[in-house]
Regions:
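Conserved short alpha-helical segments that host acidic/polar catalytic motifs at enzyme active sites
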Residues: 2-143
């Protein structure tokens, strides 16, 4: 999941494509920033160093941005056991990101907006943060 924008991405699309490793480029299906960001993050070591890969990819895409807002994003991804999420904006206006543990469902949800009436149970992820959710354990690190 990715929500956000890269200022001037239409002008930086080719440069972003060039950052995707050859072995991963065959998986590129569209021309959107989310897909390029994810493939570059995979090339930056997302499978073995999620926080490092996201931090490196954010820095790379922030440098590609040519217009204001330079870079705004939230993302969430999983290896099937651990859920990861990130929230970041170069201008302090990051898209919203919330998480919540459900005792009933025995799982965690990460969403851009709370989807039920029990808003008090949702916790907002701070801007410039990387999250690791493993069952009920929550670790939030500043990016």
């Amino acid at each position: 999941m990715h929500n956000g924008q890269i200022g001037g991405f239409e002008a930086a699309c080719k440069a972003a494509d060039m950052l995707i490793p050859d072995a991963l480029y065959r998986h590129r299906r569209g021309a959107i920033d989310s897909e390029a960001f994810f493939l570059v993050a995979l090339g930056n070591g997302l499978a073995t160093d999620p926080i490092g890969a996201i931090a490196r990819t954010i820095a790379t895409f922030e440098a590609l941005a040519t217009k204001t807002p330079k870079f705004r994003m939230t993302s969430a991804f999983s290896d099937g056991k651990i859920l990861y999420a990130a929230r970041y904006a170069s201008d302090g206006f990051a898209p919203t990101l919330y998480h919540r543990w459900s005792t009933l469902q025995k799982g965690r949800a990460v969403v851009s907006e709370p989807f039920d009436a029990v808003c008090g149970l949702w916790q907002e992820v701070p801007d410039k943060s990387f999250c690791v959710f493993e069952r009920q354990r929550v670790q939030i690190t500043t990016l």
